Amino acid sequence: MSAVEISPDVLVYKSPLTEQSTEYASISNNSDQTIAFKVKTTAPKFYCVRPNAAVVAPGETIQVQVIFLGLTEEPAADFKCRDKFLVITLPSPYDLNGKAVADVWSDLEAEFKQQAISKKIKVKYLISPDVHPAQNQNIQENKETVEPVVQDSEPKEVPAVVNEKEVPAEPETQPPVQVKKEEVPPVVQKTVPHENEKQTSNSTPAPQNQIKEAATVPAENESSSMGIFILVALLILVLGWFYR
């Protein structure tokens, strides 16, 4: 008989595995000193251990509840559970003074690690074949509910096609704008010649009048100068006649 006995080797959970169920592990202290234990698991989200750490007096046996919280759906018949538990025991000769084992576990492990006794406990699922037909029906119903979602998502591509048709609509409005721009220059070209003709017609008489006025001015100047010249000549003749 060993100083500490831990059992069983395997925890078995039966269908339906979608419901909560409880199995037990026992820890027996066959030594003459107090021991402390702690339980660890590879799947803490699916199990709850009570207590997960405690003290076992000499000659005492403690039943540890291992509560399976249940799966979201029933697994397949050939599913193999790989969940495991590790039970570790250490000597605890000191008074814990009301402290929890979890709070002093690191100190006990550092001091009595070489005297530790541990055991691995495996988990097994017993899956009933009667559960699977209902599961298959649920899976088919889920698939049927998923198919309409896929169909609803396909029409979302339609707006993309509509947008592609709307894009070429912009070039169709451009040709009328170009025609209007081409019509404007001929109007300007027609109006420019008329204005130029008016300006040339109005400006042509001005040089003729100026020429006439310029012609009359020299004629008058020449006539006045000739009169003065004649008078001077006559005066010279008269003065010359008197001095003889």
Swiss-Prot record:
It is found in: Endoplasmic reticulum membrane; Nucleus membrane. The modification Phosphoserine is found at residue 106. The modification N-acetylserine is found at residue 2. Residues 199-211 have a biased composition (Polar residues). It comes from the Eukaryota. Residues 153-168 have a biased composition (Basic and acidic residues). PROSITE patterns: MSP. InterPro entries: Ig-like_fold, MSP_dom, PapD-like_sf, VAP. It is a single-pass type IV membrane protein. PANTHER family: AT11025P-RELATED, VESICLE-ASSOCIATED MEMBRANE PROTEIN-ASSOCIATED PROTEIN. Present with 3497 molecules/cell in log phase SD medium. Acts as an endoplasmic reticulum (ER) membrane anchor for cytoplasmic proteins via binding to the FFAT motif of targeted proteins. Regulates phospholipid biosynthesis by modulating the subcellular localization of the transcriptional repressor OPI1. Also contributes to the tethering of the ER to the plasma membrane. The MSP domain is required for binding to the FFAT motif of target proteins. This is Vesicle-associated membrane protein-associated protein SCS2. It comes from Saccharomyces cerevisiae (strain ATCC 204508 / S288c).
